[in-house]
Swiss-Prot record:
The lineage of its organism: Bacteria, Pseudomonadati, Verrucomicrobiota, Verrucomicrobiia, Verrucomicrobiales. Its EC number is 6.2.1.5. This is Succinate--CoA ligase [ADP-forming] subunit beta. It comes from Akkermansia muciniphila (strain ATCC BAA-835 / DSM 22959 / JCM 33894 / BCRC 81048 / CCUG 64013 / CIP 107961 / Muc). Pathway: Carbohydrate metabolism; tricarboxylic acid cycle; succinate from succinyl-CoA (ligase route): step 1/1. It holds the Pfam family ATP-grasp_2.
């Protein structure tokens, strides 16, 4: 789960992480009143969408940039009016863009140094890792690819938490000196406390800045939370903005289906994440384009299969479905019954390729063959992928 930047600032304030004040607004008039109440000499107006690259983005109404620094309340109102209820297109949104329903009015600060700082889970080392760089405000992937020596990493023992020397080590590596060291070590320590307390999978600050009046603060932030731990954080769940998410992913979540939408035209329903990724790979290998990742898990019911089919066929780009099931815990006869019922319930209009293997596979194949539905059977994954690709050509 992701949250907006203005919500990230609220969490920073809660955990004592220094950050310029920022308040969300839903109308241009509300934005102007917010700026008036703040009473600053300059403001930054930011479109609130779950996507990076806002500053270089373009609105479909022709307005350039999702981040603007302005010097008056009147300018705040004008810029907010051009952003709100308009679609912002960035390198991360794709051509469809994202509708801006909120903007944030924040304190504009003058900078003399920008750094990159993040905490995330290192799955290989099974512990959190701090990733930092003196080259902030940039695409960190580009920095890592072209100047890997500029990336600083510090692994944290989860049993001990971040130790004072580790926070200081990062601050020194970011080339901070004097009074800035104390501020930076406090900020780094508090961000780690936030990371663990809220079950985050990522807290990214880009940039972490030093202002001209010698303040160390988090200027922009991105949060990801562990969905499996959200039940412990109802206050975080309240921050969820489903309008920013793929509606198919939201719908799939209601039925415990793991779904991620893609841009292809072959819908996939598979049991097991590894098999799902292998299925997507082999579709690509044979010249096709998968439309999604969908893992129904190991205990799919007829209702789950029906809902999965309904979600897959709601994508107008999908021209064929490929079902790839390995029956271990899940029996092939049960999944076959679910496929038949689902195909009848939603009145399937597109080619359906089914590959079954495993427990009760022969019974499952007979159920499909006797169903009267135009199912395209496949005996192995190669054959299934080739038939699915052929069906959309």
């Amino acid at each position: 789960m992701n949250i907006h930047e203005y919500q990230a600032k609220q969490l920073f304030e809660r955990f004592g992480v220094a950050t310029p004040k920022g308040i969300a607004a839903s109308t241009a008039q509300e934005a102007a009143q917010t700026a008036r109440n703040m009473g600053l000499s300059q403001y930054v107006v930011k479109a609130q969408v779950h996507a990076g690259g806002r500053g270089k983005g373009t609105f479909k109404n022709g307005f350039k940039g999702g981040v603007h620094v302005v010097k008056s309340v009147e300018e705040v109102e004008e810029v907010a009016g051009k952003m709100l209820n308009q679609v912002l297109v960035t390198k991360q949104t794709g051509e469809a863009g994202k509708l801006v329903s909120k903007i944030m009015v924040a304190e504009a600060v003058d900078l003399k140094k920008e750094c990159y700082f993040a905490i995330l889970q290192d799955r290989a080392r099974e512990c959190p890792v701090i990733v930092a760089s003196t080259e902030g405000g940039m695409d960190i992937e580009e920095v890592a690819a072209t100047r890997p020596e500029a990336i600083i990493r510090e692994h944290i023992n989860p049993a001990l938490g971040i130790l004072p020397f580790q926070a200081l080590k990062i601050a020194v590596a970011l080339e901070l000196t004097g009074p800035l060291l104390r501020q930076a070590t406090k900020l780094i320590t508090n961000v780690y406390k936030l990371f663990t307390a809220l079950d985050c999978s990522l807290v990214e600050i880009n940039p972490l800045v030093v202002t001209t009046d010698d303040r160390v603060c988090a200027l922009d932030a991105k949060f990801n939370f562990d969905d499996n731990a959200l039940y412990r954080h109802p206050e975080i769940m309240e921050m969820r903005d489903e309008t920013e998410e793929d509606p198919r992913e939201v719908e799939a979540g209601k039925y415990d289906l793991n779904y991620i939408g893609l841009d292809g035209n072959i819908g996939c329903m598979v049991n097991g994440a590894g098999l799902a990724m292998a299925t997507m790979d082999i579709i690509k290998y044979y010249g096709g384009e998968p439309a999604n990742f969908l893992d129904v898990g190991g205990s799919a019911t007829e209702e789950m299969v029906t809902n999965a089919f309904r979600i897959l066929t709601s994508d107008k780009n999908v021209k064929a479905l490929l079902v790839n099931i390995f029956g271990g815990i899940m029996r092939c006869d049960v999944i076959a019954q679910g496929i038949v019922a689902a195909a009848k319930n939603i009145d399937m209009k597109i080619p359906l390729v089914v590959r079954l293997e495993g427990t009760n596979v022969e019974i499952g194949k007979k159920i499909l063959a006797d169903s009267g539905i135009a199912i395209i059977p496949a005996d192995n994954l190669d054959e299934a992928a080739q038939k699915a690709v052929a069906a959309v050509k």
